[in-house]
């Protein structure tokens, strides 16, 4: 059905233009990759300016418009005061309002009625256990970003203004009504003149004015709270600015298109992932045209199974893709709800809607990997330090009372089913701890929680026994064993060595998990391990290996000597008894057993080596013959020869030290001649 634009008032559009001109600094979006420039011609000339969030300009703009602020403030404060009075009344009656499900529902409904900005606020609060009690967190996670649609004629008007031509000249078809309507815009299904099926997203009218006015009010209240409320642990102004920046990015459909292209470049080549294309000719600040993807929501399990698709496998694909987003490239989809993840007929997982994206800095990515490793190994002392590095705790925080609390919250995390103990339940359990201790949730982590909790919700619906942490750890183990970054090499060192002792069980655990990670390449790991061992970066491993070899060979030599000496003494004693005619009696003597603790340690080490060999044999791509060139490389390498020299020197030093010690003991045991003379006198 071809759309027919109707004449409408331009009051909403005029208000947007005034606000944009006065509030927002205009900047040109990043240029597209060269391939797109070649395909589309002078693309940079087609693009109008886009805009960014500037809080100072917003504050200055609305300070001069007190009547607008007052009108909106009244609309916000009356329902908000009713809610606060209800909380106060609950406290007067001796009830705890923070555990009231009715109050949580009331808050969700209040935020929905206040409009787009407060829907986004509620979604942001649903990932802030440092600010919101657990019952309220549960309810806010159900907050739906859905609003009634606005008239088609307004949408068609926006299309013409943004793209420079009436909708019927651009699209051969547009659905008679929107197929979805959210807080910031609505989506139509369409078809281009060239026949491609497309999704057309159009922004709501008067959106910028409403969003900026709400941001001004929230920011003003946050500034007042920062000045007046001394016990606030979180910076409400920074949280408001972070939220506003996200909303401004979502309102700019150019930015969403750029996000989609970047996501496709990073993850679109993965074999089971699909990312739709952007039609830049038909995209503007308030209109986005992208490829239409036919698929089934992951929550529609029966329909997926009817297509012969393994829904559980698709969730695993989503988990692995999310891990790459979070921990490999640091650019991730922060809103993977069921409507944005589709099962395609060919079994691939399609990602949609790139308005809410976020980035993680390298030190944060490495910190998260370290935290997961410490969590899995129940190393809560190190986990507490990770929270300091990840900005959850200030550097001067006393960690002693926090460590046992972490153990209580995370103690059984890895072994539990996702339905019993998952990211959301961990978040719920941490909420009480965050009220008790001075935790603060960084903005980047709030979006990670939102992303992973949403993905886990889908997993639970498909398979209640799906273990997200167990599925995630093989990837973590692979990264820890193969990543060449200095941060993860240090983490590997701390994980495998403690007080000079090698922790074989942790290496076994890493290899056992890493071999189950998709894309694990045994040849690559073997070559990387050899290269690392012989490089300058592997010095600490070589030092530990030399120490282990020296100790093991020394203990073996000492035990062998003790055993030989004991046997000789037994033989001499036996022969002496025979000469005295007491051989029979000697046979009845109990042979003294020399304590040999080092032998038990050697047997334990040998058992660990056997376990490692068994794990390697079970690894895809394993072949014992692959060790031959590696061993040859190690033998002829000068570094290996130096290790041999260090082992020999270490053994010699131990032998000399032992001789000196025995000589000193012998001197101490001999009587002093001077004392004998005095005693005789």
Swiss-Prot record:
Pfam family, one: ABC1
Gene Ontology molecular function terms on file: ATP binding; protein kinase activity
Cited InterPro entries: ABC1_dom, Kinase-like_dom_sf, Prot_kinase_dom, UbiB_kinase
Superkingdom of source: Bacteria
CDD domains recorded: ABC1_ADCK3-like (cd05121)
Family: Belongs to the protein kinase superfamily. ADCK protein kinase family.
Annotated protein name in UniProt: Uncharacterized protein sll0005
Organism, as annotated: Synechocystis sp. (strain ATCC 27184 / PCC 6803 / Kazusa)
Lineage: Bacteria, Bacillati, Cyanobacteriota, Cyanophyceae, Synechococcales
